[in-house]
Design a protein with these regions (language model features):
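Amphipathic alpha-helical scaffolding segments comprising HEAT/armadillo-like alpha-solenoid repeats
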Residues: 2-3, 26-37, 56-68, 90-100, ...
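Inter-repeat boundary and helix-capping residues of tandem alpha-helical solenoids
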Residues: 70-71, 87
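Structural detector for internal amphipathic alpha-helices that build alpha-solenoid repeat scaffolds
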Residues: 5-26, 35-56, 76-88, 107-118
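Long, helix-rich interaction regions
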Residues: 1-15, 73-77, 99-153
Length: 153
């Protein structure tokens, strides 16, 4: 099997991607995560699509989503969210997001834009989080789109 370094340094190829996904599904949990994690760190554009197809355990998906919260910009954070939400569930994503309200407002701000739970019963909780965010950070603005804290005024 190829290494993550080899995988991300080659042009996209559907056959190769399918072979890697087949191997990942048969690999141990740790091997799957290790390969996907290294691929993500080297080239998120090629690594993120592996997240969903590798069928990772929720604990690994949390690590990946938290990384995406911090290192995904205002647009790409959506890719991290979409790659992990089916394995974590909307409620867990909302819990992870809510946990950042006090210390990482930039994460909450950029994710609230994309977060659309498929479970309509969660919509009141999402609205409540939006209200808390707006009350806590009434004039929130940031001159950057990655990291955890706002910059500027």
């Amino acid at each position: 099997m190829m290494s993550p370094e080899e995988y991300v340094n080659q042009p996209r190829d559907t056959k190769r991607e399918n072979d890697v996904c087949k191997w990942l599904r048969a690999a141990s949990e740790h091997e799957k995560f290790e390969f996907v994690w290294r691929a993500i760190r080297l080239n998120p554009g090629l690594g993120i699509p592996l997240v969903r197809t590798a069928q990772l355990r929720p604990v690994y998906l949390e690590v990946i989503l938290e990384h995406g919260f911090v290192y995904g910009d205002a647009s790409t954070v959506r890719l991290w969210y979409e790659a992990t939400v089916s394995g974590l569930g909307d409620r867990k994503v909302l819990q992870l997001l809510s946990a950042h309200l006090d210390r990482a407002p930039l994460i909450v701000n950029k994710m609230l834009y994309w977060f659309r739970p498929s479970d309509e019963r969660l919509l009141p909780e999402v609205q409540e989080l939006k209200k808390k965010f707006e009350a806590k950070y009434p004039n929130f603005k940031s001159s950057r789109s990655t990291g955890i804290h706002a910059t500027g005024t």
